């Protein structure tokens, strides 16, 4: 039977134990391999300050690499009676190496241990989100360029308003993602700071070398003040949640548009039948369930910052068990967002557009502004031109000129997609993921 790291000479009530452990054993599986990475950096530093012998370090690192491989394959489990991944890793080391395995916790608390686990996990997941956003972005830019000359109605108040184009529609969401990437970058920069060495939130009497662990783990810098490092629990999750919610907001709006444009009353876009679902009673149905679920999941993700804030917003300085509950909403959110991004990219790639929407005369009035502008350009006062065209429409005499010429930046005839791509590339170049990746490879080699 495994012993708890904090166990003394009394037994905790089983119901209290069940309630306080909660879902920790399950959720910590997300963090297991990152716990190993943190331990590898920590013990390397311990050896450098004389708290471990060189041969002890070599044996511990070798065994930690074995545990990492198990976790990386998804085979890591917390044994019965083990509270969390920290305890399980220490138990596995002790089972293999005896008392040597008990030395890895010197100068460390589970508080800074889980902080570093969360940061290592989160920065890895943020990179995967960034990669998925870029794939969707590229699909949108490609579609925007492909259909840049195909007009569609633009709407205000859900009323036909002015000419738009598929180039503008696809490109608008691409630029939205380029802006969202700035939020992801800010979240990554705030995440990629080392809390290790803050212990329970008040530091340690051991002469820890925090600069060394910062470099070993590929962090950009550290959370310098040990009290602030602990205060960062919850704050980091909230900041990342805001960035994820921003991406989700773009996805939700795009999914709503796609559902609406796909319905028979609009008929602007068509989804391949293999990307739709059917009805058990209506044989003609081809439902856009993928976009409906992207919309629902993305709307759910937009509540994530509020969920995190409501757990942490009335906590004073220091660690509290309340913070464990954040894991329940935070850790699974990455897979949900990645899934939505991947599905959106896949279905956007397959989407077909109706290139003859404007053959329908019901869209003729949206060219009225073009006519007003032409009359004004020819010298008629704008208000007189507006009234003249309005009266023609009311009398059923308006004859649209559908040959439009928009040339300013960001308009139908000048999408500026190359500028939008430059925005995205600039932001991507400033993440510097290679620092993280190289550090982790170096630890594991």
What are these model-predicted stretches?
Residues 1-203, 208-214, 221, 277-278, ...:
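A helix-coil-helix interface module used to build multimeric assemblies
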Residues 2-38, 99-100, 267, 282-445:
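Glycine-rich cofactor/substrate-binding loops
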Residues 42, 63-70, 92, 96, ...:
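Generic, well-ordered alpha-helical scaffold segments in large soluble proteins
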Residues 60-61, 217, 273-275, 362, ...:
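A general structural motif at alpha-helix termini
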Residues 105, 110-113, 157-164, 168, ...:
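Alpha-helix capping and helix-loop boundary segments enriched in small/acidic/polar residues
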Residues 119, 123-130, 134, 141, ...:
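Short amphipathic alpha-helical segments with heptad-repeat character
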Residues 146, 183-186, 190, 219-226, ...:
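Conserved helix-loop functional segments at active or binding sites
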Residues 217-305:
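Acidic, glycine-rich loop-and-beta core segments that form the ion-binding/anion-interacting portion
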